[in-house]
């Protein structure tokens, strides 16, 4: 059985890149469907990023109660994810997902 995949770009700014090995851009090849056979969503991607990509143990700086932490702006192809259905947005080939921390220490 072959698994269909999607190529997407994920970017982190505003300090979030430090949670991802100080790498701002991540070109990812991910499965088109989750373990249940449903199309993968941004919500699935957030979990995938925490489980597979993030090397830092401070996952609570990125997620809170299984959701993207308040204070992190998420853009899907340069549009606010609130306009795209937030975590339920179904990922498409060549999507660009940008996570921006709007909270800065001082």
Curated annotation (Swiss-Prot):
Major site of localization recorded for this protein: cytoplasm
GO molecular function: protein tag activity
Cross-link annotation Glycyl lysine isopeptide (Gly-Lys) (interchain with K-? in acceptor proteins), location: 106
Presence of the UniProt keyword Electron transport in the record: no
Post-translational modification: C-terminal thiocarboxylation occurs in 2 steps, it is first acyl-adenylated (-COAMP) via the hesA/moeB/thiF part of UBA4, then thiocarboxylated (-COSH) via the rhodanese domain of UBA4.
Modified residues (1-thioglycine): 106
Record's subcellular location: Cytoplasm
Disulfide bond residue pairs: none
A GO CC annotation given for this chain: cytosol
Entry keyword set: Cytoplasm, Isopeptide bond, tRNA processing, Ubl conjugation pathway
Gene3D superfamilies associated with the record: 3.10.20.30
SUPFAM superfamilies, sorted: MoaD/ThiS
Keyword Cytoplasm on entry: yes
Pfam families: Urm1 (PF09138)
Alphabetical GO biological process terms: protein urmylation; tRNA thio-modification; tRNA wobble uridine modification
Function text: Acts as a sulfur carrier required for 2-thiolation of mcm(5)S(2)U at tRNA wobble positions of cytosolic tRNA(Lys), tRNA(Glu) and tRNA(Gln). Serves as sulfur donor in tRNA 2-thiolation reaction by being thiocarboxylated (-COSH) at its C-terminus by the MOCS3 homolog UBA4. The sulfur is then transferred to tRNA to form 2-thiolation of mcm(5)S(2)U. Prior mcm(5) tRNA modification by the elongator complex is required for 2-thiolation. Also acts as a ubiquitin-like protein (UBL) that is covalently conjugated via an isopeptide bond to lysine residues of target proteins such as AHP1.
Family label: Belongs to the URM1 family.
Full protein name: Ubiquitin-related modifier 1
Native species: Sclerotinia sclerotiorum (strain ATCC 18683 / 1980 / Ss-1)
Lineage: Eukaryota, Fungi, Dikarya, Ascomycota, Pezizomycotina
Primary gene name: urm1
